Regions:
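Internal gly/pro-rich beta-alpha loop/helix module
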Residues: 129-242
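Phosphate-binding active sites in nucleotide-utilizing proteins
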Residues: 246-323
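A short helix->loop->beta-strand "cap" motif at the edges of active sites that frequently abuts
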Residues: 117, 174, 323-327
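A short, charged/proline- and glycine-enriched loop
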Residues: 3-6, 243-249
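Cysteine-nucleophile active-site neighborhood
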Residues: 301-375
Length: 451
């Protein structure tokens, strides 16, 4: 299958160079200009897509080259961008940074190569002059086919930009697409797992509008659209997704404590026949009525542990449901909620042991999970790509999967049973379609108990 898909990948020289700010400014400026736009994010990050979603009013896809083969990457990109004039893809870390310090595997560069996407590189030009060209020269010559077609200078001044832009275009033949000056009043705060979430930024819309207004003055949006239109059509074989079966209702925990979900994973569950019913473990007294399954995603339960403990009725409702066999997927923060306690605050108590602050990132990064037993989602020996990203650990993290990092380091993790997956690893259902199908089928088996 071949699909036209104008697209543009906003990459950075390094983490902290301003690519999220620049991406958000461009997205908001395009929306304000009436351009139909889609958004995507390289890698497994949950938070940046939340900002994209707030701006464009639609989901943002994750394009992760560790999770997906070429066909799936291109399918998700084409599906998300259908009917749009352009898809703006935000990179992750530095352009060439991948797994480990000496590899570009799973990097933004790999996404650009595998999706044949033209790249605009964001360089931090604060306090720099000719050195900006030296940095750009390195990025252009590090890889023969780097796909870099344009440059945006972040932190640049209106006085410096014309000279630097002219030098960039004359020396390298790369389009200078504009700059964004320093705007400290529009900065996005960070915490231990990256940016704070979009829902926690009180004046997010105002900040995005200020960024967009400046971008409309200083960034050549038409040049970006021209670069996006130069992208070749996407060629791929779409995944074989079964037709939707009998309708089921799956409760999805969605509030400030539980907000880490891949929107394409949720959409896949819908395509398979699931109605997703949102609820809040923070605010609601009990689970919604007539659920056939439960999805507890990740997030920041440790920041809301006192409030989660105080909602004893919800904790009891979830414990009773899981213990009676309601099919349940609980990832990272959702897994923590099912344990006895978080930092001494009582949780649902379905699983033994408590969670504690490890004081550092624990088992951070990509891993391949291999099921050690048959369970609701996986047959013994089956694998799925996953990632862990947390500073908290558990006394009993489970042992029903073998997790192995690309470096070869391995450990046992997660709980798996006939109606349960619970563990620190996050995964994307498009990384193993069978897991999504089995989850929905398990929910259908639960349905007769409610009739």
């Amino acid at each position: 299958m071949q699909k036209a898909a104008p697209r543009l990948l906003i990459a950075g020289t390094n983490s902290g160079c301003g690519k999220t700010t620049v991406t958000c400014a461009i997205l908001q400026a395009l929306v304000n200009a009436g351009v139909p736009v889609a958004a995507a994010k390289c890698g497994p990050d949950y938070i940046d897509p939340m900002f994209h979603r707030e701006i464009i009013g639609a989901k943002s896809s994750n394009l992760d080259p560790f999770f997906f083969d070429d066909d799936t990457l291109r399918f998700l990109l084409a599906q998300n961008g259908a009917g749009k004039d352009v898809t703006v893809i935000e990179g992750v870390m530095g352009y060439y940074d991948g797994i480990g310090l000496d590899s570009s595997r799973a990097s933004t560069f790999e996404v650009a190569q595998r999706t044949e996407s033209p790249v605009v590189l964001v360089l931090n030009a604060k306090g720099a002059g000719l050195s900006v060209l030296a940095v750009l020269d390195g990025f252009l010559h590090f890889a023969t086919e780097n796909r870099i077609r344009g440059v945006i200078l972040n932190g640049c001044t209106a006085m410096s930009y014309p000279t630097l832009a002219r030098a960039i275009e004359e020396r390298f033949g790369v389009r200078a697409c504009g700059f964004l000056p320093q705007m400290p009043d529009c900065s996005l705060e960070s915490r231990h797992l990256g940016l704070i979430t979009a829902a926690e930024v009180d004046d997010l819309k105002e900040k995005m509008q200020r960024l967009a207004a400046k971008a409309q003055e200083t960034i050549d949006l038409n040049a970006l659209l021209q670069i996006a239109k130069s992208a070749p059509p996407l060629t791929f074989t779409p995944p074989d997704i079964p037709a939707a079966g009998e309708h089921v209702r799956i409760g999805v925990a969605r509030d400030r404590a539980f907000c880490f979900y891949y929107e394409d994973s949720l959409e896949l569950l819908r395509r398979l026949g699931a109605e997703l019913v949102p609820f809040s473990p923070l605010s609601d007294e009990r689970l919604p009525e007539d659920l056939h399954g439960l999805y507890l995603g990740g997030g920041y339960p440790e920041l809301y542990a006192e409030r989660l403990e105080a909602n004893a009725a919800m904790r009891a409702s979830i414990r009773a449901a899981v213990e009676r066999g309601l099919p349940c997927v609980a990832e990272c923060g959702g897994f923590m909620y099912l344990t006895q306690s978080i930092a001494g605050h009582a949780m649902a108590g379905v699983l033994s042991g408590s969670c504690f602050d490890a004081g550092k990132l624990t088992r951070f990064g990509y891993a391949t999970l291999t099921a050690q037993r048959d369970s609701m989602l996986f047959a013994a020996g089956e694998q799925i790509s996953a990632h862990e990203f947390h500073r908290w650990d558990a006394e009993n993290p489970g042992e029903d999967f073998l997790a192995e990092k690309p470096s070869g380091r391995s450990w046992r993790c997660a709980y798996a049973g006939e109606t349960l997956y619970a563990g620190y690893p996050h995964f994307h259902f498009y990384a193993n379609l069978s897991a999504a199908v089995r989850f929905v089928e398990a929910c259908r088996k639960e349905k007769p108990r409610h009739e």
